[in-house]
Each structure stands twice: as structure tokens, then as C-alpha cells.
Swiss-Prot record:
Belongs to the RBOH (TC 5.B.1.3) family. Calcium-dependent NADPH oxidase that generates superoxide. May be responsible for the oxidative burst in response to pathogen attack in the leaves. Its EC number is 1.11.1.-, 1.6.3.-. Phosphorylated by CPK. It is an enzyme of class 1 (oxidoreductase). This is Respiratory burst oxidase homolog protein D. Residues 171-182 are annotated as: EF-hand-like 2. Residues 548-670 form the FAD-binding FR-type domain. GO terms for molecular function: calcium ion binding; NAD(P)H oxidase H2O2-forming activity; peroxidase activity. The chain crosses the membrane at residues 319-339, 352-372, 398-418, 455-475, 498-518, 676-696. Residues 194-229, 238-273 form the EF-hand domain.
Length: 858
């Protein structure tokens, strides 16, 4: 047998059987599990592959195979096979050897008191921190600094103190300080990877009186400590109830205490399996992992070609739109440049006037074009009623709006600089003979700059530059997102309000632009003054949309049916659905509340489903407008009930009036184009995904009802269109799960066919296996098995800890749905956009499963 140290992962090991034996000897395949410094046998089976397994591997190999132009080959040598003569099953190995293959190995995989460290390289860092923290304390580390020294964050300070106490008790250390030698002993124990050492350390933390027994009160205290470290306030409140549950489970004889072996049993009953790996064939998973392993193309030309090809395949819709736009701008600039090069002004001002006029022509185009991406009704109509969405990236409307704004800023700079630093000085310094052809346009030769500034052209141009500079600055992300902290009263210049109101300065800008275009230099004929021609249609279209919004919101009256304020500062408004308000899941609408601000409209995803008899939105309180909205709706109701968790109707006297406008198209509305969906929501970003899930659930109900009546299903958007829906909701607050608790419970009960997979992640809880969350994991398994309710979310859907391994999520979907096209819809913080988008590209390029990534973009 080969040395297990030659292998670094738990793979199936095999090699040809002994050639000296007869070929008629039966062969078996031994699967070994090698982890760290331990090895255990997992299975003994016939070494001959079944036809099904061969077909499965062959199919995946074909699916993973790409064309030669992509520079990829079939993955070979998935695992080495070792064929041995048949032998009798040997007795089970000793218990310490077999730990690797028990559920405890998975339950305590990574069950560390220090995250992502090891006893070797980690100690050097700990020593360095020790020297820094004890520089003024005679090389003795105080108990209060222990957590900081070993690398725990401040939020785990309480847990670190209890860990210190446990380690000190075992060594009979009674002082509140330790030396470096004692710290090394502590470190060796908490960094020890063996199951028994970790279990003993955790037991010592709970057993505060060191009598070898755990009482119900000690269990309650450690539950409180774990819940506090993981920011699980609800579990803290129910600590006594959960302690009683553990005692009921383990203290069957009602002795009033439990022993170490009872705690081990509890751990064995709560195995942890990394997300994304469940249900994966190990060989297939390894093949895909090898296929996805980054490879560097040595030929720079081929590498550049491959990168360009993938870029064009992934972004062809954006590319052709941008190329068309750039081409039109280049054509207009060249046209004006050549036109003015053949005029008399060229003899005085040279190429400067050509550049200024070329930039001005491009500015006219962009000032017209920038209005089109924000004509939301038009875009929604084109998205819903036409097939243009297949060629035009409507999802990028706001991004294109920003790109055009950048081009306008560049154009203004070129136009102004060309005039101010080149054209005007040349006019001032030209000889009388050379200047004479310019007299019809400028009159007598000017003597200073004031001549150019005081005219209509100069004044209008300066005012436009100032107003656009203000609007552009306040629209930048740092100002709009309140990332810049300014002293009072300048703090009013940041936030959404400043962005919203400053953008209305463009009403003045466009008015001045038309005036500026009429009074422009060097052109007298009216038909050559083309500014108004560029702007006419976009301004009419945009103005019509604003009028339509005002009219529609006043006609479509809504009544508030329900108001609720949830943990995590989320306000829910449930209102009546106006007649004719037809929308799709994933779309959004604008909300206005005159009691907060009569002029402000804010977009929010619709969280109700099209089949519901009401409209609902979930609003996260993050800015000045939403804060005021919460204050308005949280006033005490006339019945005396608290408005923060109120359920009362619109006909109450002091209830604020709400207007809505919409619905508007969004990327998530295209979910019906796919049979397999990956829905990802971060925090409040789950709202459009919830509407999609509700719609699918409603259609499942309709299908079931139709089936019960033995009728043919009428709905075209029902469950039958979807093979699988994966929904990942990641939030950092336990209370967030209350927002959609009813839907999750309903989904867990009725989705018997497993069409919808719900994965909840609470990032405030330390990763599965961390000592600070170990007891939470135990409680979770016990309570879910006994009562069918998750202790973190309070629903039937079990909650995962920390963050998903997104690569494993994609890998699992790619293996489960070969040759499929998967719609990936994401709504949340920008940080995850790049990660999910890049993974979608990687898996689309290297597997037969294609992932189409869509990000919500209001």
C-alpha cells in the first residue's frame, strides 16, 4: 500500500492488483479518508465500475470537453485506483483511529477556538502580539488581553475570557496574568486539531466548577455566552428553555447533570456538511474542480485572443451599443471639424475652433441621449412588449446614463478649454486684416475677455458649467450614499435628497442650452442652429413620462392595509392593489408620502406576487427620507397600540397618504426565461427574489388545485416550467428572517417535490465548526429534529452559518444541471456583484452549464 502521506486529500486510492496473482482473483476497491494526520477506511467494495458510473463519468467528461480553440482538454486521472485481492473484513480499528470517519469529524471539522490558524505559523504572530501587549507589564499577559493576543475580535471578548478561565483551571492558575510559557501551553491546546482535545477544552469551558459534570445552569450560561458571541438575541432570551431541552435529551435518568460522553453524543448527532457539497458524486466533483482550476496560457497572443473572445461572447450586446455610440460621436466630431476647417474662422483661430465646434456637436448628441435611459415607462414597455431585450441591454440603462454623463463632462471640458485658452486669445491678438472676416460675428475686435463673457453665449455657458458641476458632484456615489461626512450645515449636501433636488437643476441647464444654441458663435442661419433639433424628442418624451407619473399616481388611489416594523429597521407597507395595476415579479415601483416630502419618489421592489390581492414593499431605514417615513408610520395608532408593530387600516384619522407609480421593468422580471434559477439576495436585497418565489408558490397552488379538480393547468408560469430554483438569502441579523417567515414556513410545508431550495445564511454567526458557534449548531439540530423549527430563523427552513462558498454553490448547480442555461439574479451590496458575475463567466466558459448573471439596478 502506498504511503498515505503522499496524498493530501480524501480521494479514492487504487492501483493495479498484484500481477503475480491470477487474473481470476476478485478485486475490491478500498476507499480511504485521509485528513490531517489520521486515516480511516470508509468502504470496501467491488473494484469494477458499474455501467451507470462509467456512463456518468463519460457524460461529464463530454460535457466538460471544450473545443480546441478554447485550449482545453478532457480531465484525466480523476483518482488512482488500487486493486487488492479479496480479504475478510478486519475488526474495527481503535477508537482514536476511527474518529476521522465518525460524524464527530464532520461535526468538529474546523471546531477551532481560533479561526483559520494552526499551531505552527500562527504562534509566531501570537508571540509578536504578546510582546506588544506586555511591553509595560513585566512580560505578563493580563486576562483581559488574552482574546486580543490570540486573534479573537472584540465581539468575542466574553467568549475569550471564558476560554482563558477554562485553560487556567485545568492548570491550577489562579492569578489573572500568564507568562509567555503559559501562553504557549494555552496555544498548543486550543490549536490542537485532535477531536478529543477540542472536545475536552469545550467541556472545560462549560464545566466551571471543574467537577466533571454539567448542570442545567452551566449549560444555560454557555448558551447565553455562545448566543451573545454570535449576536443571536432571541436565543439569549430563550436560553433557559434550550438548556432544559439539552438536559431532557441527554439526562434521560434525570440525575440533574450530564457527563463528557453525553456531550460527545450530542456532537455526533449534529454532523455538519459544507454547503454545496451535499449530494455531489465525489468523482464528478473532483473532475469539475480540476477543470475549473486556473490555468495560465503561455502563448501571449493565444491568451489575448481567448480573453477577447470570451469578453465579446459575454458582453456582445453592450459592445455593439457602445461601438455604435462611439462611432456616431466620432462621425459628428469629424463632420464639424472638417466643416470649420473650410471656413474663414480657421484662418484666425486654427484647429482650436474645429475642436471646440466638434466637441459642441457631440455635446448636443449626449445631452439628448442622456435622457433616454431614465425614461422608465418607455424602457418597461420596450422590455415587456418587444423582442428588443434580446439585442439591447436594458438592464444597463442606469450604467449607460452614467457613462454618457462622463462623456458630457469630457465634452464640456474640451469645448470650454478650446474657446477660453485658444480661440478667444487668438481673436484678441489677431491683426486687423486677419480679424476683419470675424466682424460679422463678433463686431469690432475686442480688447479683453469681458467682451466674450458678458454676452448671452458667455453668461449662459458659465451658468451651465456651474450648475452641471454641482449636479455631477452631488450625484457621485460618495455624496449620494452619504459616505462623506461634512460638518453642519454642509451635511445637507450629502445623501439622496441632495442628489434628487440637484438633478432638477437640469431644467435650468436645458433651458440655457437651447438659448446657448440659438445665440452660438459663427452661425447665423436658423436651420444650422441644430441644438433644439437634437433635444426636442428626448425632452418631449421625458416630460411626458413625468406628467404621466403625476397623473397616474393621482388617479390610482391606494389604501394602506397593514404596517409593520421589523427587527433590522425594516418597514413593511401592505396596500390595496389599484385596478389595472398589472406587474411581474421582480419589478419595482416608486413610493411617495406627502407627509414626508411632497416631491420625493423612491423606488422599492414589489415583494407581493402578481396573484396576490394586495401590493407590498419592504423598506430598509437607511437614509433621511426613509427615517422620516418610519417616524410618520410609527406614531401611536388611534387605538393606542404601538405603531412600530401595528396592523391597522387606512381609515384611521391620522394615517399618512401614500402614492405609488409603476410598475417598472427590472432584470429580475426575466426569470421565466429559465428552467433553472439561482436567486441571491443580501439583506433587504431579498425583496425582488421573494416576489419571484411567491409567484412560483402561488402557481404551484394553482396547479395542485387544478390537478385536484382533474383539469388541465391554465397557468403558463407555473411550477412545471421550472426544474429547480435555488434561493440564497444572506443576512447579518437574526431578526431579518421575521420579514418573510410566513412564506418560508409555507414553502417548507408545500414544496414536496423539492423544486425550490431555500438556503438561509446568518453571517453574524461564526462559521460552522467554530467553537463560538458549536453549541448553537447542536441546539439547532436537536430543536429542528424534535420540533421542526430552526432556532436561528424561527422557521422550518434550517439556517446556515457565516457566508456561502459561492464557488461550491455554482459547482453543485453545474453538476446537477449539465447542458442547462441557469438564470442568476442578484440584488444587494455591490461587493458581491463582481464575485458572482466572475463565477458565472468562469463556469460558463469551462463547463456545459451556462450561467446568465443579472444584477438589480434601479
Amino acid at each position: 500500500m502506498q504511503n498515505p502521506e503522499d496524498h493530501h486529500s480524501d480521494r479514492e486510492l487504487s492501483s493495479p492488483s498484484n500481477t503475480t496473482k491470477s487474473n481470476d482473483d476478485k478485486n475490491v476497491e478500498i476507499t480511504l479518508d485521509i485528513r490531517d494526520d489520521t486515516m480511516a477506511g470508509q468502504s470496501v467494495k467491488n473494484a469494477t465500475k458499474t455501467k451507470a458510473e462509467e456512463a456518468e463519468l463519460e457524460a461529464l467528461g463530454k460535457n466538460l470537453q471544450k473545443k480546441c480553440s478554447f485550449g482545453a482538454t478532457i480531465v484525466r486521472n480523476v483518482s488512482m485506483r488500487m486493486r487488492l485481492p479479496s480479504f475478510k473484513r478486519q475488526p474495527h480499528p481503535p477508537q482514536t483511529f476511527d474518529r476521522s470517519s465518525t460524524a464527530a469529524q464532520n461535526a468538529l471539522k474546523g471546531f477551532k477556538f481560533i479561526s483559520k490558524t494552526d499551531g505552527g505559523s500562527g504562534w509566531d504572530t501570537v508571540q509578536q502580539r504578546f510582546d506588544e501587549l506586555t511591553a509595560t507589564s513585566d512580560s505578563l499577559l493580563p486576562r483581559a488581553k488574552f482574546g486580543e493576543c490570540i486573534g479573537m475580535n472584540r465581539e468575542s471578548e466574553g467568549f475569550a475570557l471564558e476560554l482563558f478561565n477554562a485553560l487556567a483551571r485545568r492548570r491550577n492558575i489562579t492569578s489573572g496574568c500568564i507568562s509567555k510559557e503559559q501562553l504557549k501551553e494555552f496555544w498548543d491546546q486550543i490549536a490542537n486539531q485532535s477531536f478529543d482535545s477540542r472536545l475536552r477544552t469545550f467541556f472545560d469551558m462549560v464545566d466551571k466548577d471543574a467537577d466533571g459534570r454539567l448542570t442545567e445552569e452551566e449549560v444555560r450560561e454557555i448558551i447565553c455566552l455562545s448566543a451573545s458571541a454570535n449576536k443571536l438575541s432571541n436565543i439569549q432570551k430563550q436560553a433557559a428553555e434550550y438548556a432544559a431541552l439539552i438536559m431532557e435529551e441527554l439526562d434521560r435518568d434525570q440525575k440533574g447533570y450530564i457527563m463528557l460522553e453525553n456531550l460527545e453524543m450530542l456532537l455526533l448527532e449534529a454532523p455538519i456538511q459544507p454547503d454545496g457539497e451535499k449530494g455531489l458524486n465525489r468523482n464528478l466533483s473532483h473532475m469539475l474542480s480540476m477543470k475549473l482550476k486556473p490555468t495560465l496560457e503561455t502563448n501571449p497572443i493565444k491568451r489575448w485572443y481567448n480573453n477577447l473572445k470570451y469578453f465579446l461572447l459575454d458582453n456582445w450586446r453592450r459592445v455593439w451599443v457602445l461601438l455604435l455610440w462611439i462611432g456616431v460621436m466620432a462621425g459628428l466630431f469629424a463632420y464639424k471639424y472638417v466643416q470649420y476647417k473650410n471656413k474663414a474662422a480657421f484662418n484666425v483661430m486654427g484647429h482650436c475652433v474645429c475642436v471646440a465646434k466638434g466637441a459642441a456637436e457631440v455635446l448636443k448628441l449626449n445631452m439628448a441621449l442622456i435622457l433616454l435611459p431614465v425614461c422608465r415607462n418607455t424602457i418597461t414597455w420596450l422590455r415587456n412588449k418587444t423582442k428588443l431585450g434580446g439585442a439591447v441591454p436594458f438592464d444597463d440603462n442606469i450604467n449607460f446614463h452614467k457613462v454618457v454623463a462622463g462623456a458630457i463632462a469630457v465634452g464640456v471640458g474640451i469645448h470650454v478649454l478650446a474657446h477660453m485658452t485658444c480661440d478667444f486669445p487668438r481673436l484678441l491678438n489677431a491683426s486687423p486684416e486677419k480679424y476683419k472676416p470675424m466682424e460679422p460675428y463678433f463686431g469690432d475686435q475686442p480688447r479683453n475677455y469681458w467682451h466674450f463673457v458678458k454676452g448671452v453665449e458667455g453668461v449662459s455657458g458659465i451658468i451651465m458649467v456651474v450648475l452641471m458641476s454641482i449636479a455631477f458632484t452631488l450625484a457621485s456615489q460618495r455624496f449620494r450614499r452619504n459616505k462623506i461626512r461634512l460638518p453642519r450645515p454642509l451635511n445637507k449636501l450629502t445623501g439622496f435628497n441632495a442628489f434628487w433636488y440637484s438633478h432638477h437643476l437640469f431644467v435650468i441647464v436645458y433651458s440655457l442650452l437651447i438659448v446657448h444654441g440659438i445665440e452660438l458663435y459663427l452661425t447665423k442661419e436658423w436651420y444650422k442652429k441644430t441644438t433644439w433639433m437634437y433635444l426636442a424628442i428626448p425632452i418631449i418624451l421625458y416630460s411626458g413620462e413625468r406628467l404621466l407619473r403625476a397623473f397616474r399616481s393621482s388617479v390610482k388611489d391606494v389604501k394602506i392595509l397593514k404596517v409593520a416594523m421589523y427587527t433590522g429597521n425594516v418597514l413593511t407597507l401592505q396596500m390595496s392593489k389599484p385596478q389595472g395595476f398589472n406587474y411581474k415579479s421582480g419589478q419595482y415601483m416608486f413610493v411617495n408620502c406627502a407627509a414626508v416630502s411632497p416631491f420625493e419618489w423612491h423606488p422599492f421592489s414589489i415583494t407581493s406576487a402578481p396573484g396576490d390581492e394586495y401590493l407590498s414593499v419592504h423598506i430598509r431605514i437607511v437614509g433621511d427620507w426613509t427615517t422620516k417615513l418610519r417616524d410618520v408610520f410609527s406614531e401611536p395608532s388611534p387605538t393606542g397600540r404601538s405603531g412600530l408593530v401595528a396592523d391597522y387600516l387606512q381609515d384611521k384619522i391620522n394615517y399618512p397618504k401614500v402614492l405609488i407609480d409603476g410598475p417598472y421593468g427590472a432584470p429580475a422580471q426575466d426569470y421565466k426565461e429559465y428552467e433553472v434559477l439561482l436567486l441571491v439576495g443580501l439583506g433587504i436585497g431579498a425583496t425582488p427574489m421573494i416576489s419571484i418565489v411567491k409567484d412560483i408558490v402561488n402557481n404551484m397552488k394553482e396547479e395542485k388545485y387544478d390537478h385536484d379538480l382533474e383539469k388541465k393547468t391554465v397557468s403558463g408560469s407555473g411550477r412545471s416550467n421550472f426544474k429547480r430554483v435555488y434561493f440564497y438569502w444572506v443576512t447579518r441579523e437574526q431578526g431579518s428572517f421575521d420579514w418573510f417567515k410566513g412564506l418560508m414556513n409555507e414553502l417548507a410545508v408545500m414544496d414536496c417535490d423539492g423544486i425550490i431550495e431555500m438556503h438561509n445564511y446568518c453571517t453574524s454567526v461564526y462559521e460552522e465548526g467554530d467553537a463560538r458557534s458549536a453549541l448553537i449548531a447542536m441546539l439547532q439540530s436537536i430543536n429542528h429534529a424534535k420540533n421542526g423549527v430552526d432556532i436561528v430563523s424561527g422557521t422550518r427552513v434550517k439556517t446556515h452559518f457565516a457566508r456561502p462558498n459561492w464557488r461550491n454553490v455554482y459547482k453543485r448547480i453545474a453538476l446537477n444541471h449539465t447542458d442547462a442555461r441557469v438564470g442568476v439574479f442578484y440584488c444587494g451590496a455591490p461587493a458581491l456583484t463582481k464575485v458572482l458575475g466572475q463565477l458565472a463567466l468562469d463556469f460558463s466558459h469551462k463547463t456545459s452549464t451556462k450561467f446568465d448573471f443579472h444584477k438589480e439596478n434601479f
